[in-house]
Amino acid sequence: MENFPTEYFLNTSVRLLEYIRYRDSNYTREERIENLHYAYNKAAHHFAQPRQQKMLKVDPKRLQASLQTIVGMVVYSWAKVSKECMADLSIHYTYTLVLDDSSDDPHPAMVNYFDDLQAGREQAHPWWALVNEHFPNVLRHFGPFCSLNLIRSTMDFFEGCWIEQYNFGGFPGSDDYPQFLRRMNGLGHCVGASLWPKDLFDERKNFLEITTAVAQMENWMVWVNDLMSFYKEFDDERDQISLVKNFVTCHEITLDEALEKLTQETLHSSKQMVAVFADKDPQVMDTIECFMHGYVTWHLCDARYRLHEIYEKVKDQDTEDAKKFCKFFEQAANVGAVAASEWAYPPVAQLANVRAKSDVKEAQKPFLSSIELVE
């Protein structure tokens, strides 16, 4: 990857981590593994069900990788919610990642979307049918305002993925398009609203803080993800419709200029996030800070983002940014580098296979009439 701007990436990452005062102390190692396994186990059993297996039609290895990635994201970032809430959110966000990786045209299955919704019929699109079935398990954790945000943001996400099917980065001069698409498919409001379960927060009492958090999180969360994803997406053909690449097309600027634009906006958002909530409800600030730090840890430690490659490349360099980045990376790894073998078991495919064999045995049992049962 000769053209990747490594030095610039190091400087940007270091500034971000310094701005949020990164210091992930969300869990002990034992607590982290316990929560990871609990959320994974419930989610794995969910996706091993015959209905999910039949309707999703996802390659088993891809589903396994998606589930492990999402469980890590939720457990590391939603550190204050219950284990049950973590598990239900893990299922929901795994559905979104599965859709994000899909290449199916949604148009045919969406022709009667509203008519089916209004009539209470099952959606023709299999993803919507499954997500709607699971939604009550998610929404039971939240009040009506937060729930509305989760529903609406999920609908926006579906639309954003639909747009991405066209592999369209925007027309030159359409300056609003990149942020429009990123807000649409970023799940920012869903994430921002799902930090406030009703067993921990009264959404009426904390309405102003929650509303502001949803507004601020929309940009912060997706922009940090875009920065941390920049390395893995740089030469990946599947990831060419990214915010940075769309900036290049629509604003008619260079890649370096686009990255600088994203960097400045992310750093400004990080400053705002810390400053706005510094003097607000301490529980609210603690929740936001734990999310921010856990979210960064997840990016640094999850193999999906390949940031260990950057670490290996620069760990012997003597520049200030390289040394700072490596220190932050090692700090994250000390708390967040947990092998999947310690918590992501059994595999979904194994669970699905066991269920399938069980269903076959059940179907092969001899039928006994009521008279035979009495005899």
Swiss-Prot record:
User: Catalytic activity annotated for this protein?
Assistant: (2E,6E)-farnesyl diphosphate = trichodiene + diphosphate
> Mind listing the GO molecular function terms for this protein?
trichodiene synthase activity
Q: Which Pfam families match?
A: TRI5
Q: Does the keyword Ribosomal protein apply?
A: no
EC number(s): the record gives: 4.2.3.6
Q: Which keywords does this Swiss-Prot/TrEMBL entry list?
A: Lyase
The pathway this protein participates in, as annotated, is: Sesquiterpene biosynthesis; trichothecene biosynthesis
Source organism, top-level taxon: Eukaryota
| Entry's Gene Ontology BP terms | sesquiterpenoid biosynthetic process
InterPro entries attached to this UniProt entry: Isoprenoid_synthase_dom_sf, TRI5_ascomyc, Trichodiene_synth
Q: Which SUPFAM superfamilies match?
A: Terpenoid synthases
Q: What else is known?
A: Trichothecenes are sesquiterpenoid toxins that act by inhibiting protein biosynthesis.
Sum up the protein's function in the record's words. Answer: TS is a member of the terpene cyclase group of enzymes. It catalyzes the isomerization and cyclization of farnesyl pyro-phosphate to form trichodiene, the first cyclic intermediate in the biosynthetic pathway for trichothecenes. It serves to branch trichothecene biosynthesis from the isoprenoid pathway.
What the record says about family reads: Belongs to the trichodiene synthase family.
Query: This chain belongs to which protein, by name?
Result: Trichodiene synthase
Which species does the entry assign this protein to?
Fusarium cerealis
Top-level taxonomy: Eukaryota, Fungi, Dikarya, Ascomycota, Pezizomycotina
This chain is encoded by the gene named TRI5
